């Protein structure tokens, strides 16, 4: 009888071990490239294609870097994150008929946007629409051809804005 219980316990342990799903850790630094693919892990050697693809694989407080000067699509930011596309790798966002970057993050989250070229193609609404977060830092970014605002800063609580 004791052997039956031991075998049953061992079988249950194996069953639970096999059914457990592994935790997917997010990277603190990810990359995007015009020749990337959003199914990639967004590493330097296997970059993502869009900011939206990279942001889901980047840990809160992490950063996304551009490997080349391509268009990386619009993005909604819901956590502390930095997007750096300075130098010859300026990242582009084409936001025809929509907003380029929507920020709706936590009350203490800092968001940094650096080196972005955001184009509304005359029908885009806003380059950046900041709804919530702790602070927004914009460095060396261009916002052009929007029907409403380049930067719309209407936080739901206390927040800071720094533009260089």
Each language-model region and where it sits:
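Solenoidal tandem-repeat scaffolds enriched in leucines and small polar residues
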Residues: 149-164
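Bacterial N-terminal signal peptides
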Residues: 9-20
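Cleaved targeting-peptide boundary
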Residues: 26-30
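Right-handed parallel beta-helix/beta-spiral solenoid domain characteristic of secreted/periplasmic
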Residues: 74, 80-129, 139-142
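Sec/Tat signal peptide C-region and signal peptidase I cleavage site
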Residues: 21-25
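N-terminal secretory signal peptides that target proteins for export/translocation
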Residues: 1-5
């Amino acid at each position: 009888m004791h052997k039956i219980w031991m075998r049953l316990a061992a079988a249950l342990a194996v069953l639970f071990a096999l059914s457990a799903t592994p935790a997917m850790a997010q990277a603190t630094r990810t990359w995007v490239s015009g020749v990337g693919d959003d199914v990639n892990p967004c590493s330097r050697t296997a970059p993502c294609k869009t900011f939206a693809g990279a942001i889901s694989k980047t840990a809160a407080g992490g950063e996304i870097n551009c490997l080349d000067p391509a268009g990386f699509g619009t993005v909604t930011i819901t956590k502390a994150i930095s997007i750096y596309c300075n130098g010859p790798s300026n990242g582009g966002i084409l936001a025809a008929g929509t907003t380029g970057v929507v920020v709706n993050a936590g009350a203490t989250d800092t968001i940094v946007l650096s080196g972005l070229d955001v184009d509304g193609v005359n029908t885009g609404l806003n380059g950046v629409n900041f709804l919530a977060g702790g602070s927004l830092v914009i460095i060396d970014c261009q916002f052009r051809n929007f029907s409403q605002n380049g930067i719309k800063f209407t936080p739901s609580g206390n927040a800071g804005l720094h533009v260089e």
